[in-house]
Amino acid sequence: MRCLALDIGGTKIASAIVTDGKIEQRQQIATPQADAANAMHDTLANILALYAGQFDYVAVASTGIINHGVLTALNPKNLGGLAEFPLKESIARHTDKPIGLLNDVQAAACAEYKDEDKNAVQNFVFITVSTGVGGGIILERRLLTEPNGVAGHIGHTLADPNGPVCGCGRVGCVEAVAAGRAIEAVSSQWNPPCTPKQAFELFRKNDEKATALIQRSASAIANLIADLVIGLDVQKVVVGGSVGLAEGYLPLVKQYLNMMPHFYHCTVEQARHGQDAGLLGAAWWVADCLKQGVHLK
């Protein structure tokens, strides 16, 4: 079956036909900013017209939370004019094919999981450590999405009850301690100020301040992994994102995890898929849902 896959981000929208895990006719345009809702309706109409007659179903990976086909977020301000955008309804105006939607990190989790030995790995988590911290959770070989689309927002679990206030409003979330934005909040106050990239360069040179800062982030992610293992019996975790893939970061996470009792351990690996993870993962997930007879809300 041929899939029209879309990956809707804050700055770009990618689209392609995905057939048997192969991407064809990939296009990329800027995400509308001015008059965002009306412009997004027009953009989606144009994309559907471009690929008309070439697909059997539509799969969408999007930033934010997909709640019953509507785009929202823990902090709706992050979506600007697209908060509460009726994403599924907008697409359905232009096609009668099945439509499946999930958030971009859930889609990336599917991209990382799709080639796993499903008999060996039934419980799997993808964690992205980037500007923020997010995740996708697969339990008993099925992506956890229901009922309100928030499953996988593991960056908003607790890391430090006395830590910084997170953008979601809670104190001490993992994201507020471990994410690139959290690293920058500290390193930007140094003399001279540093970006997260520069902080990592100093970390690799054994700078004391930078090492403590990166260790704080890696320790929070290691504890998050341990919580997932003990709470959900997770067998494998894959880590991606600009921070998660930074040189020296994942070995540090593993080091902290290995210091814990063995029943908190699991396999931890680096993400393999890059910019097209959203397209590939969304296409795989919707195809699997259709194969299993799962209703796409």
Curated annotation (Swiss-Prot):
GO BP annotation list: N-acetylneuraminate catabolic process
InterPro entries: ATPase_NBD, ManNAc_kinase_bac, ROK
Keywords linked to the UniProt accession: ATP-binding, Carbohydrate metabolism, Kinase, Metal-binding, Nucleotide-binding, Transferase, Zinc
Keyword Metal-binding: yes
Ubl conjugation among keywords: no
Entry EC number(s): 2.7.1.60
Annotated ATP binding sites: 5-12, 132-139
Listed pathway(s): Amino-sugar metabolism; N-acetylneuraminate degradation; D-fructose 6-phosphate from N-acetylneuraminate: step 2/5
Binding-site list for Zn(2+): H156, C166, C168, C173
Molecular-function annotations in GO: ATP binding; N-acylmannosamine kinase activity; zinc ion binding
Superkingdom as given in the UniProt entry: Bacteria
Pfam families reported for this sequence: ROK
Catalytic activity, reaction form: an N-acyl-D-mannosamine + ATP = an N-acyl-D-mannosamine 6-phosphate + ADP + H(+)
Function comment: Catalyzes the phosphorylation of N-acetylmannosamine (ManNAc) to ManNAc-6-P.
Family per record: Belongs to the ROK (NagC/XylR) family. NanK subfamily.
Subunit structure of this chain's protein: Homodimer.
Stated name of the protein: N-acetylmannosamine kinase
